[in-house]
Amino acid sequence: MSDNAWLVVIDMQVIFGEPGSAWCTPGYPEVEKQIARLAPEFGDRVVFTRFIAPEHPQGAWVPYYELWPFALVPPTDRLYDLTPTFRQPQHPVVSRTTFGKWDDELAGILGPDATMVLTGVSTDCCVISTALAAAD
């Protein structure tokens, strides 16, 4: 593994992994196991992200949360917790109210010459949104 490679674990949270959640993602347990096996290969170079609801949705998020009002809870709500496998206080956590997680905070953690290895359960949404923003 490259010395500047970081594993960015995107949105492995209760809201996406708990069977009773309206946003439960099929295959979550299998993906969780694979990521848990992969993470130690990166040592300290692992960062987690969380999707959280905005306090006051704006723009396209207004009708989105009208469809999903259960998710309009504070960032401290257990729904937005990382699942137990990924509650690792030694690794940084970036929380964002958007699908994509690339921002100045994440860029600052990784540094200018880092290689990102992206993983998560919603590759068609949050993972790809992060990858595309980082590529820009």
Across the structure, where does each feature detected by a protein language model lie?
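Active-site acidic carboxylates
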Residues: M1-V93
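Generic recognition of cysteine residues
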Residues: C24, C125-C126
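Histidine-anchored nucleotide/phosphate-binding helix
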Residues: Q34-E41, I128-D136
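Ser/Thr-centric signal marking residues that sit
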Residues: T49, T123, T130
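Internal catalytic-core helix/loop-beta-alpha segment
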Residues: T76-C125
